[in-house]
Amino acid sequence: PSRDYNTSTFPESDREMGNKSYGLAWDMDTQLAWAKLRTTVGWDHISDYTRHDHDIWYTELSCTYGDISGRCTRGGLGHISQAVDNYTFKTRLDWQKFTVGNVSHQPYFGAEYIYSDAWTERHNQSESYVINAAGKKTNHTIYHKGKGSLGIDNYTLYMADRISWRNVSLMPGVRYDYDNYLSNHNISPRFMTEWDIFADQTSMITAGYNRYYGGNILDMGLRDIRNSWTESVSGNKTLTRYQDLKTPYNDELAMGLQQKIGKNVIARANYVYREAHDQISKSSRTDSATKTTITEYNNDGKTKTHSFNLSFELAEPLHISQVDINPQIVFSYIKSKGNLSLNNGYEESNTGDNRVVYNGNLVSYDSVPVADFNNPLKISLNMDFTHQPSGLVWANTLTWQEARKARIILGKMNAQYISEYSDYKQYVDEKLDSSLTWDTRLSWTPQFLKQQNLTISADILNVLDSKTAVDTTNTGVATYASGRTFWLDVSMKF
């Protein structure tokens, strides 16, 4: 779990947040006379919680806490949790290659079913309000204790065919998706082409266009359940509108080059342009005539992302004694821009505090753009060591990340803090320092159990426990990347 501590204008507002996940999966491959059938059955569990130290969240227009002047917001909204269990069944049939004339075909067909069983719980009653200058409560809202659940069925069918003629391959395909929450029937085109210029795999060009549907529909449904436990004591009503939401999707255009350099070096360059459409966003407004706070979900969100990747690796590993060494170096750059707002938090409260200071300007909370998650430049060095006699593999990744921007909350001691706006929460876009991390993985496939395909793996992420913080020391809030993390994995194929 992690913990957020209060800031100068949000006293007594500490909270703890935590999450966990685990799951099981079973894969079965069946070789038929004319095709290969793969079946997967799985289950995974994901849960998270937010536990505030207090059950009352209120804003004072004239703060009575300590020596704070002007507005301050105090307290919390109690204990809220949510979880989802996903039950998965997947099957895919890969046909053996066959030839019609001078053209070969290798089609495949697949189907998937995922049932998501989710619940959310408010463990205790909490409330929020505003104390105006006269000392009276306004915008008083009670969040009742409750527990609710939501089940969503997701169905998928897909098919594609790899068509090859001489040194050119095409792969047209199509995918159908449906879920019973938004009840949208979505059809996605898929296409990929590959040209082996000299028909010897030394120089290759690839290009493709794909559409992918999906979005965080489940979280929106759980939010709606929690909103149903909300009661306005002040007489204000709440209303949520969905307006026949569409399913968010991404259009992706990709191009790639592969060139063999000398006898044993392969260079690859890839570019991907991804455009997100119909992303779900929300906005809130108050109808003064009916005293109704209206939250509208819509498909106004959109994002454009450019990804570049350049890599060098060996076609055949280096052999030293009984150890195979596979080095690889990867340069990547990602630039993304979108219009989704900051207002996508875990939970809302009706304190009337709907304006913030963003980069020195007083603006509506809904109008603040999403934080810039660009990764300007990343360089990764991968080095794998394989000892064939024992079945041991030691994989390592050393990654350098260029300095990038992040969004922080300003404290009063920060030079960028504007005292004129001391009544409001203040955000600023700052720079994160460059970082260097090392991830390692040790896996063992016992040779005496080779037929059982047993593999035991241990991962250590961020071995050096590197801490990457906001490079402004007097913000009052420090943001760090994940610390050292351990994983243990045991798998068996039969």
What is each stretch, according to the model?
Residues F198-P248, Y273-T295, L461, S466-T473:
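Surface-exposed extracellular loop regions of Gram-negative outer-membrane beta-barrel proteins
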Residues K20-W26, D85-T91, D153-M159, I187-F191, ...:
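Hydrophobic, lipid-facing positions within transmembrane beta-strands of outer-membrane proteins
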Residues S2-D14, R51-H79, Q125-K145, G221-R241, ...:
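Solvent-exposed loop segments that connect transmembrane elements
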Residues Y5-L182, S307-P317, S321-V330:
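Face-selective signature of the C-terminal outer-membrane beta-barrel domain
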Residues T39-H45, F109-Y115, P172-Y176, T193, ...:
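Transmembrane beta-barrel strands of outer-membrane/channel proteins
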Residues S390-G391, T399-I418, D433-T437, S443-F494:
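C-terminal beta-signal and adjacent terminal beta-strands/loops
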